[in-house]
Design a protein with these regions (language model features):
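Conserved active-site segment immediately N-terminal to the catalytic lysine
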Residues: 151-184, 212-217, 264
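Active-site PLP attachment segment
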Residues: 168-204, 210, 227-230
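Phosphate-binding glycine-rich loop
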Residues: 26-73, 87-91, 97-99, 164
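Structural detector of well-ordered beta-strand residues that form the stable sheet scaffold
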Residues: 50, 75, 96, 148-150, ...
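PLP-dependent aminotransferase-like
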Residues: 64-153, 160
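PLP-dependent aminotransferase class I/II
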Residues: 34-38, 46-49, 110, 122-126, ...
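N-terminal "arm"/small-domain region of PLP-dependent enzymes with the aminotransferase-like
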Residues: 1-26, 31, 340
Length: 361
């Protein structure tokens, strides 16, 4: 039995959508993108959605269109995918690294609070692995310091924080549609916002700074999504709640059948909906095997695993700084391990994975 750590799920609907676009002759950005944006904004309970060609572009566009630039600081969690920080550097600003909560792995409000300076212009909170960060205290800090809040929702399509979908809780929400995500467009991303003027700036930024054809009123990039990607996205969006329901089913199964092991299972924040982009456990020093030994044993049995993430961002060579301390992020990076939780994992495979984990330990 071979069980991959991630596997995109696409069917006849996606194939038909791509075929429809190919037959239309509109292969770049056109009506499919506009339709997908409208549907995604409605799904996220946001007023505007702007489609882009990847999640990093979404973050870059959100920051740059908010005026973030040279001399500014943006607080980001160190335990995340590196794009959470590089989007800041792409604007000429400086990422400042906050530590994370040891239970939920998301940005620690107390750590973030200590990092605010006169140069702080934004905070990027990451809804990591499908779990919302604690938005209220971070949003309050931003209001107190006249900073904006950006949601990195690349892994959290459909997550809910205190009754509200993520993506509409700050200045902007930034999503990724990479093939391993909860829904995909192949490659792609989206920015959601409730600010019409800001949305217009983002639209110019992702289209060479054009306010109308061949009239360039600001600097910008080509971050446009194609109609092919958007057509796939519309088909996937119809299935997203079903995908997330299956992910939750799989996570619940793990919770029930691995609770007697000494592996630390993922905690779930109250009043929130976790959509389990990843099911991330901790293999601590108290465990009988090292994380690497456990991963090798599972690999030998055909079970895919992964480490998200082995090096915290503040320890990456491009950002390594002696004056940055994020001890929780550093500890997590040495302990975390992801198990397959995607919608194509069957009950039979779940049983096999749990039986194997219990056997090897």
């Amino acid at each position: 039995m071979q069980i991959p750590i991630a596997q995109p799920r696409a069917g006849e609907e996606e194939i038909a959508a791509v075929t429809r676009v190919l037959r239309s002759g509109m292969l770049a950005q056109g009506p499919e993108v506009a339709a997908f944006e409208e549907k995604f904004a409605r799904y996220c309970e946001a007023r505007h959605a702007i489609a882009v060609n990847n999640g990093t572009a979404a973050l870059h566009a959100a920051l740059a269109s908010a005026g973030i630039g040279a001399g500014d600081e943006v607080i980001v969690p160190s335990f995340s995918f590196i794009a959470t920080a590089t989007c800041v550097s792409m604007c000429g600003a400086r990422p400042v690294f906050a530590d994370v909560d040891p239970d939920y792995f998301t940005i620690d409000p107390e750590s973030a609070h200590a990092l605010f300076t006169r140069s702080t212009k934004a905070v990027i909170g990451v809804h990591l692995f499908g779990q919302p960060f604690d938005v209220d205290p971070i949003r309050e800090l931003c209001l107190d310091h006249n900073a904006i809040l950006i949601e990195d929702a690349a892994q959290a399509h459909g997550s809910v924080y205190k009754g509200k979908k993520v993506g509409g809780l700050g200045k902007a929400g930034c999503f990724s549609f990479y093939p391993t995500k909860n829904m995909t467009t192949g490659e792609g991303g989206m920015v959601t916002t409730n600010d019409a003027d800001y949305a217009a700036k983002i639209r110019r930024f992702i289209n060479h700074g054009q306010s109308e054809k061949y009239l360039h009123t600001s600097f910008g990039y080509n971050y446009r999504m194609t109609d092919i990607g958007a057509a796939i996205g519309s088909a996937q969006l119809k299935k997203l709640d079903g995908f997330n329901k299956r992910r939750l089913h799989n996570a619940d199964y793990y919770d029930r059948h691995l609770k007697r092991t000494r592996i630390v299972l993922p905690a779930r924040r109250k009043d929130c909906t976790h959509v389990f982009h990843q099911y991330v456990v901790r293999v601590t020093k108290e465990f009988s095997l090292t994380r690497e030994q456990l991963m090798q044993d599972l690999k030998a049995k055909g079970i895919g695993t992964a480490v998200h993430y082995p090096i915290p961002i503040h320890r990456q060579p491009v950002y390594q700084s002696a004056d940055t301390s994020c001890p929780v992020a550093l500890e997590l990076s040495s302990e975390v391990m992801s198990l397959p939780v995607h919608p194509l994992v069957t009950d039979e495979q779940l049983k096999y994975i749990c039986d194997t984990v219990n056997e090897v330990i």
